Amino acid sequence: MSTTIIGFPRLGEFRELKFTTEKYFRKEISEEELLAAAKDLRAKHWNIVKEKGITEIPSNDFSHYDNFLDAAFLFNVVPASVQNLDLSDLERYFALGRGYQGEKGDVRALPMKKWFNTNYHYIVPKFEKDTQVKLAGHKIFDEFQEAKELGLNTRPVLVGPFTFLQLSDFEEGVKADDFVDSLVAAYQEVFAKLAELGATRIQLDEAALVKDLTAEEKALFLNLYNKLLADKKGLEVLLQTYFGDVRDVYADLVNLPVDAIGLDFVEGKKTLELVKGGFPADKTLYVGIVNGKNIWRNNYEKSLAVLEQIPAENIVLTSSCSLLHVPFTTANEEFEPALLNHFAFAVEKLDEIRDLDAIRNGQGSEALAANKELFATERVGENAELRARIAGLTDVDYTRLPAFAEREAIQEEAFKLPALPTTTIGSFPQTKEVRAKRLAYRKGELSQKEYDAFLAETIDEWIKWQEDIDFDVLVHGEFERNDMVEYFGQNLSGYLFSKNGWVQSYGMRGVKPPIIWGDVTRLNPITVKWSSYAQSRTNKPVKGMLTGPVTILNWSFPREDISIKDSTLQIALAIKDEVLDLEAAGVKIIQIDEAALREKLPLRRSDWYEDYLDWAIPAFRLVHSTVASDTQIHTHMCYSEFTDIIPAIDNMDADVISFEASRSNLEILDELKAKNFQTEVGPGVYDIHSPRVPNEGEIDNTIEAILAKVPSKKVWINPDCGLKTRGIPETKESLIRLVEAAKAAREKL
């Protein structure tokens, strides 16, 4: 057998790519310097993979921003507004992901969506009537050549044509079938050029095959691949899937003239069953056996038991998905060895793949023995009191009374807010000063008293500023928080925190998911101090800001020894205690963010309710079920596709929900109207993930579009997400325009 991985993290061991790219954005280094730094980083990563004994090394899994955006740029699926900018290729590329506002023009960023059921986000290209699909880029060739010059014959990786079409947007009057021939021709041109350069095999990532497929989608897939594989230009083709099984197309897949097929044996419920039913002897099977999404050590005995059942003759061991979704290495962590031994980040997963290959080939007995010993030892005990509390929950604990309509009237009288009330999602910019003070406090260089004084002063400034520009519902800004999950986890039992466990989320932004190690309980009040302080500084309502249980779970590395449902209920009870403490402290509007609710929704619709929504939605209701009727519960959701789960979202029984809508052209509003959505809504009126400031009239037009779909009495005006990562000048300018636009819209009601 041989070994490989689907892809490797790209930010770098210490997020070098992030920091270098941000210097470029700030014009502190040149384009040439950025490209040189990226080239050095790629070489370092390839060398790591090689030294770990992995026999097939991928290339083009690196990206300056997003691999899906790379494919759009490669195939010229770029809007005319960006094509026409008098900028370099790299500047136009970044304009697609971040937007551009400068002397050369003003364009918005392309939409951003969750990458399947992960916390990674991809940039969504749009096929327009005048889109001319053709080979227009050279990144895939450049990186293959770079590796070749280092003595490595890599396997280039590229988003497959079916997934590329499935996950892209289309202008009205345009459909995927219109681009099949031109896209196939462009892919074949890539094949030909790679073959010319000396490549022998290409990896086409077709993750969209693990979803429910209609007859039309299957027909599109087969049409694409029958045409594409008719002339492979001398290359071998690996069709790689991940995040689930390919039950809808397996029979067709194994009969295609591909040379290799990659399947997920970790998340693919039916993968083993499908393969045991037969796999062609003339194809190589890439077995995704090491989990690319979680950080726990692989149980070698369990993996070997799966491998023994696979009838395929030609096997390559690989990760279940790209290692992009886990941190770089445990080598820089400071956990006790007894803890650290249980974790495998990207570099350690290379060891696991190599170990499994060696054991299967009659070697690696020491590695197997050590692994057996690790899994034979009990890792963590149970919290009996917590388990009893969960066992005692009944239907009443998940139901808030009175019903929404009655609460809505009570809250209208209690708060007396104007029509189209204005608010923000929660966080304000975390400046260098804020981060420096937090670091100094952590290092003991700043006393508790000094740090508290700084936070109080900062909160005072922003409360006053919000009052000055006449926001209706204020926020305290979350200056004390490093991360919306880690901050809570630090006050919960059962959590561990890595020092350098960064994972890419979107663009150059990384998140550092905490690790759920054991049973979760609240250790002490978490947010009451600063939320109640902020409320004491104003007569206007200030929102208490919490992260919801489903998001805390989904943005953590979950346990594998108990179900995610049970872990979520534990977290829900901890957050419930916090909600009640906030309410008792006089905070009457409480936002419980469920930014990641959609994230772990199963990819197959048939699994949505039984496997997820039937416990995730009640877990949210459990958190707020016992608050008073005049306490208003808000929730917020980030970049996701919600249109297909609108009834479930309404069933969360929040009083107000805010969500991203600006980048996706308010598409969700039609569905809210169609489903008679009851919860009050705050569709984001401008995109905070781009540094551009909305133009004069831009927010006014967005509000007008919202009011055409949603009754004004149901509408709140807010940005589409928190403002932590933005700069102060752009934030203030944008929010002033938001308040002005809301007031102007009120005048027209």
From Swiss-Prot:
Pathway: Amino-acid biosynthesis; L-methionine biosynthesis via de novo pathway; L-methionine from L-homocysteine (MetE route): step 1/1
GO biological process: methionine biosynthetic process; methylation
The protein's enzyme class: transferase
UniProt binding sites for Zn(2+): H636, C638, E660, C721
NCBIfam families referenced in this protein's UniProt entry, alphabetically: met_syn_B12ind, PRK05222.1
Function: Catalyzes the transfer of a methyl group from 5-methyltetrahydrofolate to homocysteine resulting in methionine formation.
The protein's name in its UniProt record: 5-methyltetrahydropteroyltriglutamate--homocysteine methyltransferase
Organism from which the protein derives: Streptococcus pneumoniae serotype 19F (strain G54)
